[in-house]
UniProtKB/Swiss-Prot annotation:
GO terms for biological process: ribosomal small subunit biogenesis; translation. It comes from Chaetosphaeridium globosum. The keyword Plastid applies. It holds the Pfam family S4. SMART domains: Ribosomal_S4, S4. Belongs to the universal ribosomal protein uS4 family. It comes from the Eukaryota. The gene is rps4. GO terms for cellular component: chloroplast; small ribosomal subunit. Keywords: Chloroplast, Plastid, Ribonucleoprotein, Ribosomal protein, RNA-binding, rRNA-binding. This is Small ribosomal subunit protein uS4c.
Amino acid sequence: MSRYRGPRIKIIRRLGILPGLTRKIPKKSMKLRSLSLQSKSKKKDSQYRIRLQEKQKLRYHYGLHERQLLKYVRIARKAKGSTGQVLLQLLEMRLDNTIFRLGMAPTIPAARQLVNHGHILVNGRIVNIPSYRCKPQDSITINTRTQTIALIQQNLGTTRKTKLPSHLMLRSTENSATVKQIVSRQSVGLKINELLVVEYYSRQA
């Protein structure tokens, strides 16, 4: 399944607010209609459908292909600790998501573009792989040879009121940041029941 490129408002109307996908919020009338439909179908929802919905939230929020998400689930299953929490850590520590959580980009797709086009350096080297897994003590800076510094500073100004996750440290005046530690469950930027996602993939992973 390819990455979604259709109307994002349709997705958040169905799945709820997904900050990584879009800043848009459904209009009140749309939200009420959606809640009404949800309450009517709540009793009819099968366990499979509930798990599928949680999986879709995760996939659309982080902007992943189905195969990519399944790969992360398989890695999480082999790791020590809670599979669901390890899965969230793997996704949260991706470079594109880290750029988004720092406020350097308004969404994860926008952060992915910054990475793809060579605007981001990790430990002094250009990293153009959005799935790069950030590690504690990684230093993230903006490529001064590009013309995106003004745009990133504008994004930082827009998101200044947003609370920065505890595992990240931002030095906005220096256009740089540091990954202090692995993200905790409390700092994950999405309201999700990861156990349902793991259960969805129980026969595939």
